[in-house]
A protein has these predicted regions:
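Signature of short aromatic-glycine-proline-rich micro-motifs recurring in repeat-based ectodomains
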Residues: 66-73, 118-120
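Repeated scaffold domains used in trafficking and secretory/extracellular systems
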Residues: 12-18, 115-120, 166-167
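Asp-box/BNR beta-propeller loop motif
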Residues: 1-9, 40-60, 93-112, 136, ...
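Entry beta-strands of beta-propeller and related beta-repeat scaffolds
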Residues: 23-28, 80-82, 127-131
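Short glycine/acidic-enriched loop and turn motifs that connect beta-strands
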Residues: 32-36, 88-90, 136-139
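A generic, well-ordered mixed alpha/beta core segment in the N-terminal half of proteins
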Residues: 1-9, 14-28
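Oxyanion-binding "anion nests"
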Residues: 116-148
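Residue-level recognition of a conserved intra-blade site in WD40 beta-propeller repeats
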Residues: 19, 76, 122-123
């Protein structure tokens, strides 16, 4: 074991880590320590990691964060990465260039409170994806917790509203 990255801040908490298909580029995401997500990147297989400055990231809303959902809130295909958020807002962060530049897209998934938002995201290809979430304080509810996209995450459509699966 060899320590490759350290960050000292009272709010530091990294939720997920994922490597791209080339096994050189990697990304780890964490809750905001300022008004943006905490995202670190590697391009050398994890030997060195660098935090993206807030000036290069979309601004997060207060109480918007990521869920540590068994590492399923990140998806990569080729050089593209999608990351799902929750809490105050349930949005999708997207980069097409290994995390160098970013866009952020709204979703219709339930949001507004701490336990609400997107927990998991997956894509079959660079256009077709699914997001699932809900409200973990109300595990029996299944409203506004599943959405699909066919344009790479720019727009989302609620599906199977009121049907299982629940959160």
């Amino acid at each position: 074991f060899e320590l490759k990255y350290t960050e000292n801040h009272e709010k530091v908490f990294y939720d997920s880590i994922h490597f791209f298909d080339d096994n050189l580029h990697g990304i780890a995401v964490g809750d905001p320590t300022q008004d943006c997500a905490s995202i670190i990147l590697t391009s050398d297989g994890g030997n060195t990691w660098n935090k993206i400055p807030c000036s290069k990231l979309p601004k997060f809303e207060e109480n918007e964060a990521f869920f540590a959902a068994s590492n399923t809130n990140i998806k990569t295909i080729g050089s593209t990465v999608w990351i799902a958020s929750g809490g105050k807002k349930a949005r999708i962060l997207k980069s097409d260039d290994f995390g160098d530049t970013w866009q952020i897209f709204e979703s219709p998934i339930i949001q507004g409170e701490g336990p609400q938002g997107i927990y998991s995201i997956d894509f079959a290809d660079k256009n077709n994806g699914i997001a699932i979430g809900g409200d973990y304080s109300k595990p029996e509810e299944n409203l506004r917790n599943k959405a699909i996209t066919n344009d790479g995450g720019k727009t989302w459509l609620i599906v199977a509203d009121g049907q299982n699966p629940n959160y």
